[in-house]
Amino acid sequence: MEAHIAATLVPLLGWAVHGSVLTHRLASARRDPLTGLHTRAGWTARAEHCIRRHPSAAVLLVDLDHFKTLNDTHGHAAGDAALIAVADRLRTWCGRNGTAGRLGGDEFVAVVRDMTTADLDALTTALHRPLNYAGMSLPLAASIGACQVAELPVPALSDVLAAADAAMYAAKGRSRRGTHPSH
C-alpha cells in the first residue's frame, strides 16, 4: 500500500517542482536582474492594459545621456550603480500611477495613467540629480520623450512608443538633458 502511495506521489512532486522552476524562470524573464524593473515583455502587457483602460495615459522613453562615457571613465560598477539609481528614481516617480521597465542598455520606459507638465518636470529633476558613488558625485542626465495616448487617433502601444521614441530623439537633438513631448 505504501509503495502504491509513493508511486502516486513521486510524479506529482516532480510536476510541482517542475512547475515551480518554470514559474521562477518566467518571472525572471519578465524582470531585469540588475534593476528589478520589468523587461520589455513584462512591461508591454502592463502598458497595453493601462492604455486600454486610461485614455489619459502617457508613455515615456528615457535614455541616459553620455552613459558610455560614465561607464568607460568610472568603470562598469559605476555604470551599474547609475542604471540602478535611474531605475529606482523612475520606479518611485511612477509609484502607484504606472509601471516602469528597462528596455536594455541605458534605455528605460514608463507608462502612467495620467501625467501633467509638473509630473514630467519632477521626473526630469529626479533623473538629473547626481549619483553619489564611491565618494564621488557623478553627473547623471537623461533625454525623455513623452507621448500622451490621447494625442493619437488610434491608441496602439506600438504607435505610442514610436511617438515617444521620436520625441526622445528630438530631446537628444536639442543638446540632451531634457524632455520633449510628442506633439
Language model regions located:
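A short glycine-centered flexible hinge/capping loop motif at secondary-structure junctions
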Residues: N71-G79, G104-G105
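Signal-transducing coiled-coil linker helices
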Residues: M1-P33, R40-C50, S56
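Nucleotide second-messenger and two-component phosphorelay signaling modules
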Residues: A29, E48-A58, V62, T73, ...
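Catalytic-core segments of nucleotide cyclases and related cyclic-nucleotide turnover enzymes
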Residues: D121-T124, C147-H183
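Conserved nucleotide-binding and Mg2+-coordinating catalytic segments in signaling enzymes
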Residues: A27-A45, V62-G75, I84
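GGDEF/GGEEF active-site signature
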Residues: A87-A150
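Heptad-repeat coiled-coil signal-transmission/dimerization helices
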Residues: W43, A47, A82-L83, A87-L90, ...
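Short, conserved catalytic or interaction motifs in soluble domains
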Residues: D72, R113, G173
